[in-house]
Amino acid sequence: MSIPEIDPRAQPIQIRSAALGITRRCYVYVPPDALLQRRLPVLYLLRGHEREWVNRSEDPSRVGTAIDVYERLRAEGAVGPLIMVFPGLASADNSVPSMLSDMVAPELVAAPGIGTGAFQRFFFDDLMPAITRRFRAHPRARAVAGFSLGGLMAVKAAALRPDLFTSVGSFDGTILYAADGGARARTSDPVLANPMFDAALGVPRATDRLHVDHPITALLRADRAAIRRLTWIVQYGPEAIEPWGSNFYRGEYLLRVLNALGIANAAPVAALPDGEHTWRCADQHLAATLPIHWGALAQVL
């Protein structure tokens, strides 16, 4: 990978995590006129490493960052003042993803930045309260969205704690399949066999834990009224470039689950004809859906 080109408008901050037992870094963007505003809404953008949404050279397709997308929309009047948070939810070298889990076996890897492996508790108990305190963030106006594994984590976060968010978005999310009507994880899902998930899921896989700590089973266990209150925004790439170029089938699966729960997709189009699994397309998704998040956030301001 090329040398990261971190957007200078992204402020690095350190979060001392009681859950992880270490200090973790994240990036935060605060609009220049924040001091003129009341408490601002927050969008948490997830992927893996904290740099990914704000790195101009994250992949060769990219021509900007999430901040470029936001500031263009703000100048057009499509969104209002908004804090964006880019947390690190993987090892410091981005080789070991957490899946927004409290890892089963963090001792299996020597990668830096994992600590106890309790990333789910870090996100909910350490990071989010710290952002609210430090940046005058609105305590109820929060959105969460992600790309790829970030989409999985955004859906899981909203399913586990729908009380914390107003909207949730996923672009080409690596949504895990469930079985038995959504009561259990589908243990034959090929994604689960990837060795990069050994720390998160254990070796052999801790299936009892996986059945519970799973985006779809969590969604189906959640309070129906609470998850229906959220605005759900789901997009993914086209079927033609499956399996390596998009997560079309996983996106379709998520929409079927949401439909069974009586939840409509707020995205204008679900399967994007040119929706490759790239950062260029992730930024395009953000440009199309950030005004939808803003509409949901504005209702609680």
Model-assigned labels for residue ranges:
Residues M1-L301:
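Non-catalytic cap/lid and distal C-terminal segments of serine-dependent acyl enzymes
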